[in-house]
């Protein structure tokens, strides 16, 4: 708790002047990482949604030129931690494809798309999800197929195949980011936690386990809100302890799903 509302602000909002102001993890990713249900320090996290934030939780920043060149950032987290992470492409690619397909009269829902994609064999074409050609909206399927053609491969104009390409590419990108973070920070990761909307995508979670060769724990979906509330609860005396204690509450109160590597994917 950092104080109470200024009287003029409280009056404008119709709130008591005694209303407390709590400093939570004020970036949404900071609150999401606070809610990662990890019970040891040897974890990586992926906040997976429209975009992906992949990294480690550290006590000290990594300030090397190699780290900067690898596009990793050092951002403050809850309780003085450092969120050492790389910003990456995410499920924006798939949502944009769905928007294009819907405009063309293809009405496959996400569960059907993912089931069809999961039935395809591994080892198909991949793209770089971070390529700037994927930032703008509109006609994402064709841009993905063009990127595959540019790499010397072909990708059929089929929703299931394009979906599988996206998920394979994200999982491979996550694995590469985790390997780089381990090397640059001098850490070894035993488990990967996926939080946010992407934690509901079972194909993405399984392929991430396959690509990393590590156990993946998925959930909670609303990690940002959970982390925010937990820090407020601690400030109000309704919860206590450090991040490990708060995370123990998350693990005990949310249905988490674990994925183990079934086959090592190519990177």
Which residue stretches match the model-derived regions?
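Glycine-rich Rossmann-fold phosphate-binding loop(s) that bind the pyrophosphate
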Residues: 197
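Active-site core segments that coordinate phosphate-bearing ligands/cofactors
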Residues: 10-191, 200-224, 230-266
């Amino acid at each position: 708790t950092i104080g109470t509302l200024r009287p003029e602000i409280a009056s404008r909002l119709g709130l008591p002047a005694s209303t407390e102001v709590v400093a939570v993890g004020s970036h949404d990713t900071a609150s999401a990482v606070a809610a990662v249900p990890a019970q040891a320090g040897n974890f990586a996290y992926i906040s997976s949604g429209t975009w992906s934030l992949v990294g480690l939780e550290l006590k000290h920043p990594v300030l090397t030129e190699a780290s900067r060149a690898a596009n990793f950032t050092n951002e403050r987290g809850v309780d003085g931690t450092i969120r050492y992470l790389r910003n990456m492409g995410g499920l924006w690619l798939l949502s944009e494809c769905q928007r294009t397909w819907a405009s063309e009269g293809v009405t496959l829902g996400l569960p059907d798309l993912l089931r069809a994609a999961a039935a395809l064999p591994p080892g198909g074409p991949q793209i770089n999800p971070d390529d700037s050609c994927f930032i703008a909206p509109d006609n994402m399927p064709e841009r993905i197929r063009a990127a595959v053609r540019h790499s010397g491969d072909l990708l059929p104009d089929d929703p299931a195949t394009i979906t599988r390409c996206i998920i394979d590419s994200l999982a491979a990108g996550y694995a590469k980011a985790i390997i780089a973070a381990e090397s640059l920070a001098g850490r070894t990761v035993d488990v990967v936690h996926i939080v946010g909307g992407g934690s509901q995508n079972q194909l993405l979670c399984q392929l991430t386990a396959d690509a990393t060769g590590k156990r993946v724990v998925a959930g909670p979906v609303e990690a940002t809100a959970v982390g925010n509330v937990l820090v407020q609860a601690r400030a109000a005396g309704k919860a206590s302890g450090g991040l490990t204690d708060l995370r123990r509450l998350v693990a005990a109160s949310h249905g988490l799903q674990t994925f183990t590597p079934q086959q090592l994917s190519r990177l």
